[in-house]
């Protein structure tokens, strides 16, 4: 009875029922679509586009458009989408997340809403986690879309601007999440409208949406420039930290991963660096370097958090196990690890532009996603992205056997049991996939299997290049594959014909802190109704068990006299593990939510600056905007110099000096004239004189040259001030949590101070632009230039070398071309003399 009631009130079930009716409509259209010739089928695309211009909506077209795609897929790809795939497509079109189990054909499902939404001509982005998948899907599914008369583009990291513009101009663009984010940032750093590559963000479908919007949500995309800093302090701090002893000189909390100096450690530091007080303001940099060196030595572990490769520190993604080349830890932690490992210490970088995936993807008009595991994060998707998770039924029932966890007393006992299980299954010819959380675990199991004479493949960040081949062999008879954190998502493990009746065995060597990652590992077995078995092996020494109170259980095992070879198989323990995972997930969600609240402060500021930049780029004449800036600058200067209530205390001389230095010429404004006026009357004659001088300046050159000069000044000032502001906001953010000790809400303080800093930056921009316009010599330097050369810092480049991406430069001028300064001379005889 309860089960029936649950189904009646189950929102998901109601959605499925509603979509089932639409699927029946699509099925009913099949008889009229099937007889069409290829040409008639292609002609449907033009017919749909015309119907849209006459007032029909994409929702009206859905049943017929889906029926057309289904028929085209059957003809072009030899694959006919099932009813459940049509449901998945409907959920995606409605801006939701389709949870479809591994092997249920998510890629084919995506073609349905992609085609329908591409009919509008506004562009559809299909987002994948790496370039291999983007290329694979663009090549395979692109055939279908091109058959139906739509254009398909692929956007890769290595492409030139022209190639990217072509890719984005297509009806459908396949790309990675990183590349989309970086292109957006770069588009807001260009100096000419023609250099932009993206169109307005219309509709995106994200494959492996949980990986991008949850796991990578806290990873900001950064375009950075070099900041020159001394590397010596890192060396000194590293040498000092090596002399410290745990618990005596520093304390380490395993749960929070916090490490800090004790009183003894502080005294030791003061002696070592010959200073009186480590917490004195003049030693802020030293304290920061010591703290980062401590984190590098105590919290960060080689081959778990990072690897050393070709003399560089490369971060390991804790969720996917992939190497994240090109990405660096911030706040000097990366340099501290470089000092620890004795490799070359690289300069800290300065952020020129930054955005998180959370804020980038929220800019799309409509957003949807697909994954095999999203239900556990449903609240987050709904609250942050306004997307519901719809669990799509499987085409065939799942017959996989998910066994209860086996818990051992020690790691040694656990690994012995894992290897024994692998050996037994290998003898029977059953393919085995072993999931590990860290690279060192996969290498340990590999050594143990080698001793037993079992041939196997390892799939981790170190040999990422062979990933697709290893996954392709993983379902063959007797295959043993060890994978770190399910690297290889997006590639199916297909079973060999001779073992279809046995299925794949999945063995987990540790529970991940996220249930989703465990579910992804389980989901590799039993795809499309195949048999399969999954089993997790745990030990009391696993990190998750250590962090969440396994001491009582360990004591109980000791009391019962259990040895290492006897596991506990208990639902109670499995429930305890699951509740620990829920707690960690809750903590992680709170952290991401908090990050978003902080990032929203910068997002609002970024939108203001980027919108103004866009207006400047598109505007033919900036004079009106600049006059407004001059007016504000003058009013601020007058207010600043006439603050006192008593007239004698006004600093009129200081005001005149300021105006002479920054905006006007000597004698333009006289002290005695201003003394006769009230503060609110002073601005008017000053502004009138400024406009007169502005007019004089305009007469000195052709109008076109003057307009370009204005743009050069505005871009140079805005970009310089904005990058300095981002850096200042970074520093504010780093120290703001300390305000909590004074019973002050850090977020509110960050919002208020961030707003005050933004206001002050705007004032500074207006003042500097006014000064340059009135005081700069115009003959030289008329070409728009980037303030700093920027380079994309990839949060993950899937093990491939991150290519340096300088921010675009203006067009090159030939020596015999007319000089861009407007003099009418050839470049070689003008600004290019001596070049």
Swiss-Prot record:
<dbReference type="Pfam" id="PF02810">
    <property type="entry name" value="SEC-C"/>
</dbReference>
<dbReference type="GO" id="GO:0017038">
    <property type="term" value="P:protein import"/>
</dbReference>
<dbReference type="GO" id="GO:0043952">
    <property type="term" value="P:protein transport by the Sec complex"/>
</dbReference>
<comment type="similarity">
    <text>Belongs to the SecA family.</text>
</comment>
<keyword id="KW-1278">Translocase</keyword>
<dbReference type="Pfam" id="PF07517">
    <property type="entry name" value="SecA_DEAD"/>
</dbReference>
<dbReference type="GO" id="GO:0008564">
    <property type="term" value="F:protein-exporting ATPase activity"/>
</dbReference>
<dbReference type="InterPro" id="IPR004027">
    <property type="entry name" value="SEC_C_motif"/>
</dbReference>
<dbReference type="GO" id="GO:0046872">
    <property type="term" value="F:metal ion binding"/>
</dbReference>
<keyword id="KW-0547">Nucleotide-binding</keyword>
<dbReference type="InterPro" id="IPR027417">
    <property type="entry name" value="P-loop_NTPase"/>
</dbReference>
<feature type="binding site">
    <location>
        <position position="85"/>
    </location>
    <ligand>
        <name>ATP</name>
    </ligand>
</feature>
<feature type="binding site">
    <location>
        <position position="819"/>
    </location>
    <ligand>
        <name>Zn(2+)</name>
    </ligand>
</feature>
<dbReference type="GO" id="GO:0065002">
    <property type="term" value="P:intracellular protein transmembrane transport"/>
</dbReference>
<dbReference type="Pfam" id="PF21090">
    <property type="entry name" value="P-loop_SecA"/>
</dbReference>
<feature type="binding site">
    <location>
        <position position="830"/>
    </location>
    <ligand>
        <name>Zn(2+)</name>
    </ligand>
</feature>
<feature type="binding site">
    <location>
        <position position="831"/>
    </location>
    <ligand>
        <name>Zn(2+)</name>
    </ligand>
</feature>
<feature type="region of interest" description="Disordered">
    <location>
        <begin position="788"/>
        <end position="807"/>
    </location>
</feature>
<dbReference type="InterPro" id="IPR044722">
    <property type="entry name" value="SecA_SF2_C"/>
</dbReference>
<dbReference type="InterPro" id="IPR011130">
    <property type="entry name" value="SecA_preprotein_X-link_dom"/>
</dbReference>
<keyword id="KW-0067">ATP-binding</keyword>
<keyword id="KW-0472">Membrane</keyword>
<dbReference type="GO" id="GO:0005886">
    <property type="term" value="C:plasma membrane"/>
</dbReference>
<dbReference type="Pfam" id="PF01043">
    <property type="entry name" value="SecA_PP_bind"/>
</dbReference>
<dbReference type="InterPro" id="IPR020937">
    <property type="entry name" value="SecA_CS"/>
</dbReference>
<dbReference type="GO" id="GO:0005829">
    <property type="term" value="C:cytosol"/>
</dbReference>
<comment type="function">
    <text>Part of the Sec protein translocase complex. Interacts with the SecYEG preprotein conducting channel. Has a central role in coupling the hydrolysis of ATP to the transfer of proteins into and across the cell membrane, serving as an ATP-driven molecular motor driving the stepwise translocation of polypeptide chains across the membrane.</text>
</comment>
<keyword id="KW-1003">Cell membrane</keyword>
<protein>
    <recommendedName>
        <fullName>Protein translocase subunit SecA 1</fullName>
        <ecNumber>7.4.2.8</ecNumber>
    </recommendedName>
</protein>
<dbReference type="GO" id="GO:0006605">
    <property type="term" value="P:protein targeting"/>
</dbReference>
<feature type="binding site">
    <location>
        <position position="492"/>
    </location>
    <ligand>
        <name>ATP</name>
    </ligand>
</feature>
<dbReference type="InterPro" id="IPR000185">
    <property type="entry name" value="SecA"/>
</dbReference>
<keyword id="KW-0653">Protein transport</keyword>
<feature type="binding site">
    <location>
        <position position="821"/>
    </location>
    <ligand>
        <name>Zn(2+)</name>
    </ligand>
</feature>
<dbReference type="InterPro" id="IPR011115">
    <property type="entry name" value="SecA_DEAD"/>
</dbReference>
<dbReference type="GO" id="GO:0031522">
    <property type="term" value="C:cell envelope Sec protein transport complex"/>
</dbReference>
<comment type="subunit">
    <text>Monomer and homodimer. Part of the essential Sec protein translocation apparatus which comprises SecA, SecYEG and auxiliary proteins SecDF. Other proteins may also be involved.</text>
</comment>
<keyword id="KW-0811">Translocation</keyword>
<dbReference type="GO" id="GO:0005524">
    <property type="term" value="F:ATP binding"/>
</dbReference>
<dbReference type="InterPro" id="IPR001650">
    <property type="entry name" value="Helicase_C-like"/>
</dbReference>
<dbReference type="InterPro" id="IPR014001">
    <property type="entry name" value="Helicase_ATP-bd"/>
</dbReference>
<keyword id="KW-0963">Cytoplasm</keyword>
